[in-house]
């Protein structure tokens, strides 16, 4: 009796991973757009940090896109425009938007972590943990249920 998974189980797991990778790319695309938008509301003394987060999300997106390409999948393209869930008027609301984006990405990375192969799931967990730390750095409180909208 063989203990190897059936081809359909492997295909199903692969589809789930591809779906979550696509979701993560879409989330990082939105994060790049959002951080680019909110940079104009960040004071000069905090701009370098904000730019580093913008670049971090761009790098995360590019790594995820490469993983999809390695699987023979064309990654989702960014939208031309995104609807802001928070009206940004000043630095405080810019940090609220940044926290909202990070919270949503934490939820996506946790979903990806839950279905990934154990040898590669550390990166997803690290992305989720780093997002929670950034929320604290924005002087916001991480949500008890990461990825929740409210």
Report the location of each language-model feature.
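All-alpha RGS (Regulator of G-protein Signaling) helical domain and cognate RGS-like helical scaffolds
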Residues: 1-150
């Amino acid at each position: 009796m063989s203990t190897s998974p059936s081809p359909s189980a492997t295909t199903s797991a692969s589809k789930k991973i591809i779906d979550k990778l696509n979701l993560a790319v879409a989330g990082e695309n939105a994060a790049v757009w959002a951080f680019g938008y909110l940079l104009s509301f960040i004071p000069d003394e905090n701009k370098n940090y904000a730019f580093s987060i913008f670049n971090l999300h761009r790098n995360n997106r590019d790594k995820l896109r490469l993983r999809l390409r390695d699987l023979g999948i064309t990654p989702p393209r960014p939208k031309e425009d995104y609807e802001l869930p928070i009206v940004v008027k000043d630095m405080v609301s810019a940090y609220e938007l940044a926290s909202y984006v990070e919270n949503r990405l934490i939820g996506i990375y946790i979903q990806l972590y839950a279905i990934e192969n154990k040898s590669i799931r550390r990166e997803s967990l690290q992305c989720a943990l780093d997002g929670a730390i950034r929320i604290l750095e924005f002087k916001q409180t991480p949500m008890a249920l990461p990825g929740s909208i409210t």
